Amino acid sequence: MKAYVLHAVNDLRYEDIDIPACPEGWAILKVKAAGICSSDIPRIFTKGTYHFPTIPGHEFSGIVDSVGSAADSSWVGKHVGCFPLIPCRKCEPCSEGHYEMCAHYDYIGSRRDGAFAEYVAAPVWNLVELPENIPFEHAAMLEPLAVGLHSTKIAGISKGDKVAVIGTGMIGITAAQWARKFSCTDDIYVIGRNEEKRIIVEGTGVRYINQKEEKPADDFNVVIEAVGSPSSIDTALNIVKPGGTVVLMGNPSGDIPLSQNTYWRILRKQLTVRGTWNSSYAGRDASDWTEAVKALKDGSIKVASLITHKFSKDDAFAGFNLMHEHKQPYCKVMTIWNS
């Protein structure tokens, strides 16, 4: 099969390799679509991953091609998404069903081979069955959609809350859509620094503030930080109202220093500051993922307009480079496989 194999930092090769093995309890998926996550870019170009060689790609959808156990044969031919985290099932969070906080997890696309390939292996438990009316490109966005949902649940958004999300990536924009759904108000804002993102954000029904041209108000009940930079965290603590909640979701690109003034703001405003990580998943039981599938099916969360670029499997290098070089605005960059 064809795959993008990372052999070392900044050494990604498009090459022929064997289709992965399919042990008992696992499935082989024929990949149909795989989104490029912002975390894939440092993994490929600057920081590397846990071992080499590795195939990146953890946001994907496909069709079940084969299974390792006869008991799972009903999955063959089904359209699926996939929860990429493989829990150890031995640690305390796993025993409580909080698999997203597993202490010893495996992960498709970073700790084991992922979906920038024609085929990918995954445990059957991790498969999310899809209604066939959901396009594969939309289903490949279930992972960031569920992550955005999880952040809004951590925030505890109530009806009527005024909410800001700092960050114009797909997860930030979908978090704002979830916030709008839960607050039942149009008082939901995405804060960015690029005027070209306005049309993408406002196309989902959420308001946009270009921080370079407009100072945000300081009366938000909830602020979700979806960048991971010191300046955006500082903004979050500035614009949340006294007694409000700040949720930290953005992956940090380096150390996040905490100034004395910032610390005072947390104390004097009596803020709740929470972290969020990944998304809840429970197989076929209710979770962030089942809720995300429902939202795609009923159209209550809009994702089509967030796909700003598509590349065929043979041209995916262009997608990786586009995101790495930041020469043009983008939201979700999608790669298409086995079309």
PLM-predicted stretches and their roles:
Residues 7, 18-19, 51-57, 108-112, ...:
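Short Gly/Pro-enriched turn/cap motifs at secondary-structure boundaries
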Residues 88-166:
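NAD(P)H dinucleotide-binding glycine-rich loop of Rossmann-like/cofactor-binding domains
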Residues 195, 287-339:
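C-terminal hydrophobic helical "lid"/dimerization subdomain
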Residues 256-307, 318:
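C-terminal substrate-binding/catalytic core of Rossmann-like NAD(P)-dependent dehydrogenases/reductases
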Residues 79, 162, 244-245, 272:
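Short glycine-centered segments of the SAM/dcSAM-binding site in methyltransferase folds
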Residues 134-213:
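Mid-domain Rossmann-like dinucleotide-binding core that forms the NAD(H)/NADP(H) cofactor-binding site
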Residues 20-34, 47-92, 131-133:
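Glycine-rich beta-strand-centered segment in the early N-terminal region that forms part
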Residues 155, 182, 199-271:
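Glycine-rich cofactor phosphate-binding loops and adjacent beta1-alpha1 units
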